Amino acid sequence: MAGRTAFIPGPLRAHPAWTAVAAAGAVAAVATAAVLTVSGAGRAGASHRGAHARLAASTCSGPTGAAYVSDSGWDGFSAIDTATCQVIQTYNVGDTQVPGDPGDYNYSSTNEGIAVSGGNLYFADTGTSNVAVIATSSLDPSNYNPPEQLINVGMFPQDVAVTPDGKQVWVAETGPQTSPSSPSGVSVISTASDKVTAHLPVGGQPSQVAFSPSGAIAYVVTADGLWLLRTATEKPVGVIHGLGDPHGIVVSPDGSTLYVTDTQAGTVAVINAATRAVTHTIRVGQLPWQMAISPNGQTLYVANPDSDSVSVIDTAANRVTHTVSITGDPDTLALTPNGQQLWIGQSTAAFVTVLDTATDTTVGSINLGGPTPQSGDGYEPTGIALVSTPTAGS
């Protein structure tokens, strides 16, 4: 399919406002922590076409909290202080120790999507067909190999998404295109036990999962179209076809509208969630991948890696109002809960750029600490999870 990559295979530094987090998708909050947003899987192995214009120094000033950025190049994730845009540490994920040699590891993992629930980070490890679970409370900047639990799922997991109530993680698995013994589908993980409770067959090569605000319906993007499943029964209730080469999905905050990217046509389909009909088609850039929607639902952001740009869409008018140039194959997006900052992962620049959405100016430029992917063992950001602690009175 066009635009897809087939894969064969102690606490953080003291910060009074960093705490555990809750469900994904900026829907739920637990205890004193709040999720800002969680992005899905980026594109591992994307081709490099340009250098990133780096800032001499970061001018970032964002919400107090942490960003966790998964990457498929170095096979780990970076923990970032969102208030300063400084990388605290970059950690390994899914790399198992070689028996008898405590200093050597099998570097076979390839991390894609990331999700957060109940103080745990969940990583889709495409290279090992596992979901890696790491407690944020266990992260220690002096140790880049944090303790983790590996949950075996279907082959080639691409995306992880947490239900609004935080009780389940749904895993989109592309699977081999021809293998009846390991079909593509969705694995459901209980966050209480961190065990797989179900495997749900859906259309071929599922790429992303999203939920209605109530959590009643799961939307799974596949090569065959958009599958709708009732989460209570884990049974399909419909499929929306005719979406071209779909990849990314977001749901409007009120649940009334679905947005799905078509990577081949360079468009976004606008779908009425009640009637399941496509009401508009919006042309954006080349290979539209991930999206993010503002908290009020009025603005949609679309990452176009093959155009080195982000399209900004007025959802009331269903049209692109302007385009922001971002070099380095931008394909991963995450918005802060107030919508004031857009975090953009650049898969071939080993950078995350932070935009002020009011002015579309760069307020932070974060070097993930390694070379670009083209120089070998480099960083390729594929997912961003932003978490923060509410301020007093919020």
Where would I find each of the regions flagged by the language model?
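N-terminal export and membrane-targeting signals
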Residues: 4-26
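Predominantly soluble domains enriched in secretory-pathway, periplasmic, or organellar proteins
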Residues: 15-16, 29-394
